[in-house]
C-alpha cells in the first residue's frame, strides 16, 4: 500500500502507521500505538481493481454528518447516499478507488 493510502486509512480509523511498514505491507496500530493491541494489516497486490472489492469495510459513526465531512476532507469521494426509515449510509471511495461505507450508528 502506498504511504498516502496508509495515512488515509490510519486517519479514517484513528490508528497509527507502524514504523516498520513498507510500501508493500502496512500495519496500522491502535491509536495509542500499543503494538500488543489489535492491528490491521494491508498488503499490496500486483493486480489492478477490475471488479467489486474483495473486502468491503463498513465504518459506523454516531456523528454521521461530521464524519462524512471529515472523510471528504481526507480525500474520500462520495459515491452514493442511501436513506431508509431506520438506516442511513453513504458509500465512499478511498483515494485509490476502493469502496467503503459510512453507516449512521
Task: Specify the residue positions occupied by each region the protein language model found.
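Vicinal oxygen chelate
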Residues: 1, 3, 7, 11-13, 17-68, 88-93, ...
Amino acid at each position: 500500500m502506498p504511504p498516502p493510502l496508509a495515512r488515509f486509512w490510519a486517519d479514517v480509523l484513528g490508528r497509527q502507521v507502524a514504523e516498520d511498514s513498507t510500501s508493500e505491507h502496512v500495519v496500522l496500530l491502535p491509536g495509542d500505538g500499543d503494538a500488543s493491541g489489535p492491528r490491521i494489516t494491508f498488503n499490496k497486490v500486483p493486480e489492478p481493481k477490475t471488479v467489486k472489492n474483495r473486502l468491503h469495510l463498513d465504518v459506523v459513526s454516531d456523528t454521521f454528518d461530521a464524519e462524512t465531512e471529515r472523510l471528504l476532507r481526507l480525500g474520500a469521494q462520495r459515491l452514493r447516499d442511501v436513506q431508509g426509515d431506520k438506516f442511513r449510509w453513504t458509500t465512499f471511495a478511498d483515494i485509490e478507488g476502493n469502496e467503503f461505507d459510512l453507516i449512521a450508528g
